[in-house]
């Protein structure tokens, strides 16, 4: 077994065992994508410094950490956002907490009709065909073990679709927060 993969195997098993409750479960291509991520990570394990993309990053400390699936986003309000001035910028604000889109913290009023900002979980359940041309298409999972691990645990996130010819009047600002707590 590759370095680092044995330590993560219980978490991979947990993800695959729980995958039936993940968004989009039962949709063939989504199930296959998650399985491909788990298989690719299992074949490689944690990246090592001898891997070209990771030569300056030592991930050995991760081998000693215990992980568990996040069961939701902890209570975070607008005042908790980093740098209060960030929340006041003239942008379309998108907030993701622990990998989950938080519509209550977003400021998307005025987006054109041909622009959709949605939670990945919602799209995986309601419109998986809209995601199929994109998910799992940019990289080879066998070459990117951390992306493979992330793919095995695919549950939520955010997606932005912009129609042809659309030019926004202000930028989309993504604020991604990782928060510890009971839900993390």
For each feature predicted by the language model, list its residue ranges.
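Glycine-rich and polybasic anion-binding loops at the starts of cofactor/ligand-binding domains
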Residues: 1-184
């Amino acid at each position: 077994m590759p370095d680092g993969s044995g330590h993560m195997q219980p978490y991979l098993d947990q993800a695959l065992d729980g995958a039936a409750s993940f968004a989009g479960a039962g949709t063939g291509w989504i199930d296959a994508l998650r399985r491909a991520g788990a298989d690719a990570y299992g074949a490689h394990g944690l990246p090592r410094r001898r891997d070209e993309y990771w030569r300056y990053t030592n991930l050995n400390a991760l081998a000693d950490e215990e992980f568990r699936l996040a069961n939701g986003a902890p209570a975070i309000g607008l005042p908790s956002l980093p740098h209060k001035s960030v929340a006041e910028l003239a942008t379309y604000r998108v907030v993701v907490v622990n990998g989950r889109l938080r519509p209550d913290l977003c400021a998307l009023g005025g987006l054109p009709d041909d622009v959709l900002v949605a939670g990945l979980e919602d799209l995986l359940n309601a419109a998986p065909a809209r995601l199929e041309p994109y998910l799992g298409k940019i990289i080879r999972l066998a070459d990117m073990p951390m992306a493979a691990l992330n793919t095995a645990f695919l549950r939520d996130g955010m997606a932005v679709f912009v129609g042809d010819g659309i030019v926004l009047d202000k930028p989309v600002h993504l604020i991604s927060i990782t928060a510890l707590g009971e839900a993390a």
